[in-house]
Amino acid sequence: MRYMKLFFLVTDIGFILYWLSAGFSLIPESWAFKHHDHPFMIAWNWSFFPLDILISVTGLYSLYLQRVNRADWKLMALISLVLTCCSGLQALSFWTFSSDFDLVWWLFNGYLLIYPLFFIHLLLKEGRRTKQS
């Protein structure tokens, strides 16, 4: 669990920075995904904005709750982790169905899909252990 804070900070601040960069068109052309300038792809990309910001809000809020010793930080963390998995899965599904493979975007979204699974497992395991006590 001690590494979860680092993963949350990297992911949540990363999402905020990504959306600020996207909003102000600061992402270099060479880093952009394929067809990033087509209206459909712009809409597809921005469809993730509410989800990604909700991930950041719930993740950062769970860290705050943990810092002030509120037990419900675990529930907020679990919500954030599940939403993060969904974000990565949705993006990878789209890239798969459109037969598009860009290593950088696949790595970012693979990270979003996979890293939360370890912490979801730990939170659920800890919850079961607490319930049995």
From Swiss-Prot:
Keyword Cytoplasm present in the record's keywords: the answer is no
Report the subcellular localization.
Cell membrane
Record keywords, A-Z: Cell membrane, Membrane, Transmembrane, Transmembrane helix
Membrane topology, as annotated, equals: Multi-pass membrane protein
* GO cellular component: a single term: plasma membrane
The regions listed as transmembrane in this protein's record are: 5-27, 42-64, 77-99, 103-125
Principal location class: membrane
Keyword Cell membrane attached = yes
How is this protein named in the record?
Uncharacterized protein YvaD
